[in-house]
Curated annotation (Swiss-Prot):
It is found in: Cytoplasm. It comes from the Bacteria. Its EC number is 2.3.2.29. Its main location: cytoplasm. This is Aspartate/glutamate leucyltransferase. It catalyses: N-terminal L-glutamyl-[protein] + L-leucyl-tRNA(Leu) = N-terminal L-leucyl-L-glutamyl-[protein] + tRNA(Leu) + H(+); N-terminal L-aspartyl-[protein] + L-leucyl-tRNA(Leu) = N-terminal L-leucyl-L-aspartyl-[protein] + tRNA(Leu) + H(+). PANTHER family: ARGININE-TRNA-PROTEIN TRANSFERASE 1, ARGINYL-TRNA--PROTEIN TRANSFERASE 1. The keyword Acyltransferase applies. Belongs to the R-transferase family. Bpt subfamily. The gene is bpt. InterPro entries: Acyl_CoA_acyltransferase, Asp_Glu_LeuTrfase, N-end_Aminoacyl_Trfase, N-end_Aminoacyl_Trfase_C, N-end_Aminoacyl_Trfase_N. One of its GO terms (molecular function) is leucyl-tRNA--protein transferase activity. The keyword Iron does not apply.
Length: 249
């Protein structure tokens, strides 16, 4: 009998459930657990192969009749802002992002709840408790960080710290070839700031500064309004049967 090495991931398939993006479709996912000494390495390989991480699980769509979910990653080194993106970047120049270990706080959860209640009241995460949120942040065996965005204070140029209320948060995996944006949320009443766009732009700049070629955005579904923003950040690559292919929009 051949024994599977302990570090080799085992994969499982979920039962069919309603698709959250395309009405009338059923989704299934293949998933594995990210645990052990090789969790970082496995997460890198799986993300490069179209998987996403949620807590200590890596998953990707494995639907029987639909292939609409397409993995997207931005080519950070080649990216150029559009006029509108430059406006968003300038509009948020009073913000500063500070990197922290992946640890939850009551301040983060309060912002998270405000965001869900305003933007995703009927979504699958709408009933998450403070303990659920803590698990989302802490239950990880990979190189994960929290970036908290606040307004710049009088000493920010020295301390690199923001001042005042928490405005936005990004949960981000640091990979060998890029940054993977796992989840982000922000003050919902600041719509004029386009904070979701700003955080993606900030991650592109962070990837460039670290010499990392990619920013992973997860899945794009053509025809899904909630996913449409992802293809505005070009050039980017889409994962298909022939591997990662360049996409200019």
């Amino acid at each position: 009998m051949t024994h599977q090495p302990q570090q080799s991931p085992q994969f499982f398939l979920t039962a069919p459930s309603p698709c959250p993006y395309l009405e009338g479709q059923q989704e299934r996912k293949v998933f594995t657990h990210l645990v052990g000494d090789k969790a970082n390495e496995i997460n890198d390989l799986l993300t490069q192969g179209g998987f996403r991480r949620s807590q200590n699980i890596a998953y990707r769509p494995a639907c029987e009749v639909c292939r609409a979910c397409i993995s997207v990653r931005i080519l950070a080194g080649e990216f150029e802002m559009t006029r509108n993106m430059r406006r968003v970047w300038s509009q948020n120049r009073d913000l500063i992002g500070r990197v922290h270990k992946a640890q939850p706080s009551t301040e983060q959860y309060a912002l998270f709840r405000d965001y869900l209640d305003a933007r995703h009241r009927s979504g699958g995460m709408s009933d998450m408790t403070v303990l659920d949120y803590a698990m989302m942040i802490e239950d990880t065996h990979v190189n994960t960080q929290i970036i908290e965005y606040r307004r710049r204070g009088p000493d920010s140029f020295m301390s690199a710290k923001g001042d005042g209320e928490l405005i936005a948060v990004a949960l981000t995996d640091v990979m060998a070839d890029g940054l993977s944006m796992v989840y982000s949320f922000f003050l919902p009443h600041m719509q004029e700031r386009s904070l979701g766009t700003y955080m993606i732009l900030d991650h592109i700049e962070r990837a460039r500064a670290a010499g990392l070629p990619h920013v992973y955005l997860g899945y794009w579904v053509e025809g899904s309004r909630k996913m449409q923003y992802k293809i505005r950040f070009t050039p980017q690559e889409h994962l298909g049967p022939r591997g990662w292919q360049r996409f200019e929009g």
